[in-house]
Amino acid sequence: MEKHIKHAIRWPSLDTIPWAWVAIAIGLLILYFPTFWDLFHGLWGTERHAHGPIVFFVSIWFFYFKFKQLPEYGITYDPSPKLGWPILVLGLLLFILGRSQTLLIFEVGSLIPVLLGITLIFMGTRVAKFLWFAFFFLCFVVPLPAFVVDAATLPMKTAVSFATAHILYALDYPIARTGVMLTIGQYQLLVADACAGLNSLFTLEVLGLLYMNVTHHESPFRNFMLAVLIIPISFIANVTRVIVLALITYHWGDAAGQGFLHEFSGIVLFITALMLVIATDSLLRFFSRKFEKVPSTQSVDLKR
């Protein structure tokens, strides 16, 4: 028992961090600083990939959050260099390929095997298994190729514009739709990627998965359903945003619709989505408890 306690991972203070970890941190900074500098001043500055910085900083916080839990769960370290080195080398090769050929999916995606390899080399499989969700979380940071984004966003934009047009028409607003172009009164609105793209879906999916992992839901049914229902929740939130923008433009003009209120509608989107996630989780919690009580009641009857 004493041996187990001695080998338990403890969250180190700044004055006890070994120089090896400082060297690793400096190496990662030298390796990936140019990559993320380019992302912050390039791709992540566009509306299509605006979710990137949010997911990136949430990922950093989540790694910190999980590392702080290691002593609490008594996770022991068992370094596995034979398993970690091949994964680390693979990650470095992916980084070299991505950086040299300007393939962001490899350049940014290489961070996952690099961090996993370092974890296995110095901490082992137990810590790596404990951090599996944190590594999975990093997948949302990797920029997808443009053809994948275009193929995924076109049906979403069409569906959002279709729903918006029918809802506002039912409310007696003079609205017409041509593809993803909405005409309301004398104004035309283009349902762009930012209004119904993968950026909002990815961000909401990340927040939903983070919410599930932090709250430690034990019901597999509840976790699965909440993860799946985030997609229609994102759709409803996007429709709400486009409706708000259309009404602002119709009543206060194009300048209001494309100015500050356009950015404010993005806040409305996430508030709506988070409220729907919480409401959905409450319903799932109610039904999961109801289903869990049924077998226990039957077992009591059988004992009688």
UniProtKB/Swiss-Prot annotation:
It is a multi-pass membrane protein. Its main location: membrane. Belongs to the exosortase/archaeosortase family. Exosortase EpsH subfamily. The chain crosses the membrane at residues 17-37, 50-70, 78-98, 103-123, 130-150, 189-209, 228-248, 259-279. It comes from Methylobacillus sp. (strain 12S). The keyword Iron-sulfur does not apply. The active site is at residues 195, 241. The keyword Cell membrane applies. Disruption phenotype: Disruption of the gene does not significantly alter exopolysaccharide (EPS) production. Transpeptidase that recognizes and modifies its substrate by proteolytic cleavage of a sorting signal. Following cleavage, a covalent intermediate is formed via a thioester bond between the exosortase and its substrate, which is then transferred and covalently attached to the cell membrane. This sortase may recognize a tripartite structure consisting of a conserved Pro-Glu-Pro (PEP) motif, followed by a transmembrane alpha helix domain and a cluster of basic residues, usually at the C-terminus of target proteins. Its EC number is 3.4.22.-. Pfam families: Exosortase_EpsH (PF09721). GO terms for molecular function: peptidase activity. InterPro entries: EpsH-like, Exo/Archaeosortase_dom, Exosortase, Exosortase-2. It is found in: Cell membrane. GO terms for cellular component: plasma membrane. Keywords: Cell membrane, Hydrolase, Membrane, Protease, Transmembrane, Transmembrane helix. GO terms for biological process: proteolysis. It is an enzyme of class 3 (hydrolase). This is Probable exosortase EpsH.
